[in-house]
């Protein structure tokens, strides 16, 4: 499937509406690639691309699954449910939004990307770039 680069607020609105603000969805996979590596001469290379790819599935077929690709990820703050926590892991609401310097995926409906206080204590992903695609199910 084709990747769609988020370039403006209309692109963000389209993604949020297409995926129903992530209602009744689950994070089913996350893959983090730092870009750093050690070569065969044992020399370390620090590319620091910090790419994070997150795959979601939801209780709907139109579309069923999407993948978000966060480039140059700055922050990941998520809470994962464990069976002993007796909490649900489904997402009731989430959105993608942005400010002048970053893109955000957050569970907080009232999240204001321009308010620095909103960056603390809430579940979110913050990155310099964002693209998405409908994922193969």
Predicted regions, residues:
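Surface-exposed, interaction-prone regions used to assemble/regulate multi-protein complexes
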Residues: 1-137
């Amino acid at each position: 499937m084709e990747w769609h680069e988020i370039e403006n607020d209309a692109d963000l609105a389209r993604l949020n509406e297409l995926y129903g603000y992530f209602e009744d969805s689950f994070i089913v996979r996350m893959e983090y690639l730092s870009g750093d590596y050690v070569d065969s001469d044992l020399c370390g290379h620090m590319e620091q691309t910090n790419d994070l790819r997150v795959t979601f599935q939801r209780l709907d077929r139109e579309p069923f699954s999407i993948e978000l690709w966060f480039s140059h990820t700055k922050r990941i703050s998520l809470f994962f449910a464990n069976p002993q926590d007796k909490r649900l892991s489904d997402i009731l609401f989430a959105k993608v939004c942005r400010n002048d310097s970053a893109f955000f995926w957050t569970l907080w409906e009232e999240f204001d990307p321009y308010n620095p206080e909103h960056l603390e204590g809430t579940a979110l992903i913050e990155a310099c770039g964002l693209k998405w695609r409908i994922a193969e199910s």
